Amino acid sequence: MIDVAGPPDLILKDTAPGHLAASLYLSVGGYDASTRNITEMAVSFSSQGRRIRFVADETLTCNGVALPRGGGTFDAKVPTDTFAGKLVTCNYRSGPSLGTIAFTAPVAPAIVSPQENSEVARSARTPVTFRIGGHSTMFYVIALGPDSKAWSDPTGTRPTQVLLDTRAFSQGPGFVALNQFFDLPDLHSTGFQSVELHGQAVQQIGVTWR
């Protein structure tokens, strides 16, 4: 999930949380049925602006879920219901040292209508009703036809519907998707130098344009 170009990862002799800045990545949902109800959580750490590579016994657990470690990143994919709408507390351990990251996880966004695998009439004002998840910073709705696309950047604080111009679409299979970026207003940490978030959520359904 995390792909960062730059200098080689830093190996520290002391990886106590007081030496580290934490970066939390949350990706909720996906573009197909296999990922729609999956949340990926990844946590990486840096020191003096360089990513850390762990080589000792460091561990990270979030609400009892142990995140597997790869190099300097702890990363796990879980059913979205595992964390959605709940207070999540992540405990990082390095030897006797403990640091925590806590936040309320967002619920998944949803496309309420049209329904999955339904037939949708092409028109100048094709309605898409949706629910955003959590505290959104930016999002958009997009409709894809066999050879065209239409999208909208909804306005307002919590809109629930957009109208898309799908007249240029050909008949046939397509998709409707909601892509959302979010923050976590109550995100905080104990023991670390700092904590930051990168959050994104996606929901997509298949439809047939007629």
List where the protein language model places each region.
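Secondary-structure-rich domain cores
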Residues: 122, 126-129, 137-138, 160-162
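Proline-enriched interdomain boundary motifs that mark the N-terminal boundary
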Residues: 109-116
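Aromatic/hydrophobic beta-strand junction motif of beta-rich domains
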Residues: 42-49, 126-134
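Short, solvent-exposed loop/linker segments at the N-terminal edge
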Residues: 34, 117-124
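Ser/Thr/Pro- and often Gln-rich low-complexity regulatory segments
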Residues: 1-107, 139-146, 152-155, 160-210
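Extracytoplasmic/cell-surface-exposed regions of Actinobacterial cell-envelope-associated
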Residues: 126, 130, 143-148
